Amino acid sequence: MKGIFIAYDQAYNMEIADAMEEIGVRGFTMWQDISGRGSETGEPHLGNHAWPTMNNAILTFVPDDKVDDILAMIRAKDEETPALGLRAFVWNVETSY
């Protein structure tokens, strides 16, 4: 099992969750109106006068065989609109309840 944290510009709104459902991933936790700045490129998303945009984030836990499909979807969306900001981070989950 893997955990995937996806941070994205709020302009994507539910597009990320809807795309995950199309892949067969139903469960997730979403945070809205979070701030941040990418480590390499892109503008800050801080919700202030200088940087008014904000991010959302999703955390999902999926079987290993779903990871490549999710990352391919994320990569494709990011390549379509690179200025918005969209990143996914995957880590191992040893146990869950």
Model region roles, listed by residue range:
Residues 1-97:
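Positively charged, small/polar-rich N-terminal and surface patches that mediate targeting and assembly
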